[in-house]
Amino acid sequence: VMIPFRFLHAADLHLDSRFAGLAHLPAAVRSYLRESTFAALGRLICLAIKENVDFVVISGDIYDVSDASLQGQLRFQEALKELGEQGIPVFLIHGNHDPLDGPRLVAEMPEHVTVFGGDAPGYATAHRRRDGQEVAIVSGISYPTAKVTANTAVTFSRKPGSELFHIALLHGNVDGDLQHETYSPCSRKDLIGQGFDYWALGHIHKRSILYEKPYIVYPGNIQGRSVKETGPKGCYVVDVRENGEAALQFHELDIVRWQVTELSIDGMEHEAQWVEAVERRIEDIREADPHLMTVVRFRLTGRGNVHRLLAEKGAAADLLSELQRREALRAERKEYPGLVWTEGFAVESGLAVDRSRLLQEDSFLGEMLRLAEKGEGEGSREELEDIISSAIAPLMENRELRRLLSQVSEEEKLDWLRGAAELGITLLSGLEGAGEAEGGFRDKPDGGRYDED
């Protein structure tokens, strides 16, 4: 029989994230975004106190960069101090963004904070606050340097002779998530076999529970930082019962939420219809999350004659400027809750044409559309790769472009082909251009800073 207790599991705080592309934004919007990671940390501290947790575990990447800003370090120390004043211990590890060898303030950690080293998984005992009883063994290992490519999971082991609940802190990529760098790679099988009761993971910013016996948990980051980090962000509060089973409750911590919303132009004939649909969607978002600032990217899909306006007259860029002007005024009035900042319009729509007829045509456009259709099938991926490689070969002669293009995913290349097909339809219909209206943020070909893990 175990002694019941409660702890909070968070990871990937990325304090003082720099948010690439901020220079283009109004100062009032920019400053709120820059403050968002600190605000999420503040909400984490309040949650730990309100939920009366026995301790907090943080699974790496406290700071966004190894040479963490002075502000980031001081704000984190302040947060630790606040937890200490409430008698809440903290157990933490450092990850690939904030390794132990990063140049930071040499500050003695308070007595209630345990930082695990980088040589081998260490052990610490956690106690229940109300009576001081030992309730758990916490084990963890930090990144000594930024790049840890060894499987450190297999170096973990239960503390000999202890029957307490065992928690492991690990910052790494379980089962090779291709969206993130493969630091400290391991498999679920590796983790299950080490005999721990709860794996408190960090590194992957998307929240997920990979396994339940034992629990293998990514809480995700506490504050989204790009349209690649959409939806609620926060942490888990975990209740461990007498029978050793754990119950997890997710708590939102973010103050700025990112989302991608799809808007179909099917059947739209006039610009006014499209503008009304966009404005209505923005008000729906505002109504759904009145306590948050939302950053939204619109994916314009479907087919309709309004595509002609989006492609030829730059209607998307014009509306984007107006929407951003309105929300900038709200920001200047400090009306951040309910503010909906439109980040951009990804124009993926097309003209209202008979695509099936075009696919049957013995023409250049028909051939291109058939190629785009083939690209959707797995069997033709190799052929598709050859065609795209040939098309971009001249660009590969430039060293900087070669570096950027080498990091473009297969899915992005498919998007290029789809876009080329629609552009072909557009141009052959007498139009002069189509594309994407962006508003200050951009998905850089090298992945940008937003979704770094």
Label each region the model flagged.
Residues L253-D453:
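Accessory, non-catalytic peripheral segments of nucleic-acid enzymes
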Residues A20, P26, F55, S66-V217, ...:
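His/Asp/Glu-rich metal-coordinating catalytic cores
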Residues M2-V29, K233, D239-S264:
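Domain-start "cap" segments at the beginnings of catalytic or binding domains
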Residues V1-H9, A40-K50, A126-R129, A153-K159, ...:
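Short amphipathic alpha-helices and their capping/turn segments at secondary-structure boundaries
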Residues V1-Q73, E410:
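N-terminal active-site segment of His-dependent metallophosphoesterases
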Residues S59, G202, T301:
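Conserved residues at the C-terminal ends of beta-strands
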Residues I3, D54, I88, L164, ...:
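Short coil/turn segments at beta-strand junctions that form active-site/ligand-binding loops
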Residues C46-I49, K81, K189-I192, E283, ...:
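Surface-exposed alpha-helical segments enriched in charged/polar residues
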